[in-house]
């Protein structure tokens, strides 16, 4: 069986550039990019970035995984994958517990930061971060309200928009 792929707006954007496509969360270019890069290559990179559970439960989402369909995701891992992109493509393990103390207050175990593992070319990570931090990249679909107001002095901020299957939010 096939599927009827469409963008959240219901419109087709034949001349959208990569910046506009990613910034506006266009589905058709996302699926085409996954097709070109290959499902296995893309999934391996996604896992290396920290989204280790995505499509890891015997799920076979095929090209629909490009738009988040067909696979379970752990949001903490998904956020870590984006953090890896923000670190210039370098992965770091998640840290859920920073230290453990006994009843006397003595530290019996303490988390230690480990060196990051480079999994994506820093230039590629920079380009992705640049797109995700560019509010003008989200304007293709008329999302002028999606400026998000991220203004943290001295901090480069980025975000990724998206919609649910029913395009409600």
At which residue positions do the language-model features occur?
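A penicillin-recognizing enzyme superfamily signal
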Residues: 1, 20, 24, 71-169
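Active-site-adjacent helix/loop patches that line small-molecule binding or acyl-intermediate pockets
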Residues: 2-52, 59-87, 127, 131-134
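The feature captures the short pre-catalytic strand/loop hairpin that immediately precedes
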Residues: 54-59, 108-110
């Amino acid at each position: 069986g096939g599927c009827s792929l469409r963008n959240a707006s219901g419109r087709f954007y034949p001349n959208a550039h990569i910046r506009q496509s990613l910034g506006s969360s266009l589905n058709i270019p996302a699926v085409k990019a996954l097709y070109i890069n290959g499902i296995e290559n893309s999934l391996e990179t996604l896992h290396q970035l920290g989204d280790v559970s995505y499509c890891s439960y015997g799920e076979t989402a095929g090209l629909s995984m490009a738009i988040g369909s067909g696979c379970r995701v752990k949001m903490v891992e998904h956020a870590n994958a984006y953090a890896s992109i923000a670190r210039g493509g370098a992965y770091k393990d998640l840290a859920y517990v920073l230290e453990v103390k006994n009843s006397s207050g003595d530290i019996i175990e303490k988390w230690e930061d480990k060196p990051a593992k480079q999994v994506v070319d820093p230039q590629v990570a920079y380009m992705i971060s640049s797109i995700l931090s560019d509010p003008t990249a989200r304007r293709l679909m008329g999302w002028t309200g999606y400026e998000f107001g991220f203004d943290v002095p001295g901090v480069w901020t980025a975000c990724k928009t998206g919609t649910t299957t029913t395009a409600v939010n």
